[in-house]
């Protein structure tokens, strides 16, 4: 197509692809279509070259369940969107009953009304609140914030569990004790296992495996 010819090509279709490779369904194709329509513009029939791709890309990426959105147009008049979802690693219930996720990047992620991820759950003496912590990443927390937050150690333990297939299938609950120590609760049996801090996790779980 010459540039003059492509200017005349109308938007004929909208193609949406959501990456579900992590087995998460926080965002569906219908959700993305709703995000597009919420901008209030009628895409179909509009000249494909005049559609503000960046505006739509930023709008979709602003969804708290979206990690990244790629928006582009094709010469045949297709407006295409590919969405990558954030991947939760742990669901946290704080002392006040509020709930949120930690994702694999260490960022706070709100829960969804339509989907619940199958990840370990942390509860107990956790004072962290979503509205206070959502702008932080546990990997870059200051030392003073780590002193009062439990999220950095919970993230470290949840990451360890996720990357070890044996423990990933056996541990679905973590409890923060009044003194800040961590206890894991296996899916089978009626026993609680005190881990303490996250120091030397590899060694602690190796001993647990031998036991």
Name every feature range the model reports, one short phrase each.
Residues 1-18, 38-47, 51-58, 62, ...:
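Charged, solvent-exposed interaction patches on well-folded alpha/beta domains
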Residues 22-23:
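Extracytoplasmic "Venus flytrap"
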Residues 27-40:
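An acidic helix/loop motif centered on a single conserved Asp/Glu
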């Amino acid at each position: 197509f010459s540039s003059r010819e492509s200017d005349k090509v109308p938007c004929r279709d909208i193609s949406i692809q959501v990456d579900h490779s992590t087995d998460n369904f926080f965002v569906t194709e219908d959700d993305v279509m709703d995000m597009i329509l919420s901008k209030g513009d009628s895409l179909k029939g509009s000249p494909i070259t005049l559609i503000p791709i960046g505006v739509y890309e930023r709008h979709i990426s602003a969804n708290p369940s979206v990690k990244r959105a790629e928006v582009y147009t094709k010469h045949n008049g297709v407006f295409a969107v590919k969405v990558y979802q954030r991947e939760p690693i742990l669901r946290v219930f704080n002392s006040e009953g509020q709930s949120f996720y930690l994702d694999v990047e260490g960022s706070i992620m709100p829960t969804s009304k339509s989907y619940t991820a199958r990840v370990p759950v942390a509860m107990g003496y956790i004072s962290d609140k979503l509205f206070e912590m959502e702008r932080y990443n546990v990997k870059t927390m200051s030392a003073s914030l780590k002193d009062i937050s439990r999220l950095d150690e919970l993230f470290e333990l949840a990451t360890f569990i996720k990357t070890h297939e044996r423990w990933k299938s056996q541990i679905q609950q973590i409890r923060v004790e009044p003194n800040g120590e961590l206890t894991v609760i296996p899916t089978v049996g009626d026993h609680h296992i005190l881990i303490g801090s996250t120091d030397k996790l590899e060694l602690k779980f190796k001993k647990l495996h031998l036991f």
